[in-house]
Amino acid sequence: MLSKATVTLYEDVQEFCVAELVDDASLAACGALHVMWEDLAEIRTVAVVPDRQGLGIGHAIVDELLARARVLGVRRVFCLTFAVDFFARHGFQPISGTPVAAEVYSELLRSYDEGVAEFLDLERVKPNTLGNTRMLLRLLPER
């Protein structure tokens, strides 16, 4: 389901949310919320087992990750995706550029995380020749 190195999964396990099937407790879907800055996070690695797609499980994962972002005080959530329509249903909108102030950008440059490097669109990261779309959601404060 995921094409990530096992070490990466262990490093990021606390960021993940998973959905299990009731009948046999097997993994049905996953997704991660990676906080990049005090008010900015990325939704990463949303995946649903192929025979469980179309059942709303992926949407439930994203809803849970957005709820976690709100609890943490995150106000902007970013994703880099091919599933534009899927994320648009959650309010994400396509963006261009990097939506952070210059001083935050310079701090983020210190990160070793490849996802942060992709967010910053750094030259050392593979160019976006596949057509991924950068999307952003501005979260409203809870009432």
Show where each model-derived region lies.
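A conserved beta-strand-loop-helix scaffold within acyl/acetyltransferase catalytic domains
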Residues: 1-16, 20-23, 28-49
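A generic local structural motif
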Residues: 3-6, 62-66, 121-122
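C-terminal "cap" of GNAT-fold acetyltransferases
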Residues: 100-143
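Beta-hairpin (beta-strand-turn-beta-strand) motif
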Residues: 46, 82-84, 140
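Conserved acetyl-CoA-binding loop-helix of GNAT-fold acetyltransferases
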Residues: 48, 54-69, 78-79
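Conserved active-site alpha-helix within GNAT-family acetyltransferase domains
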Residues: 71, 75, 81-109
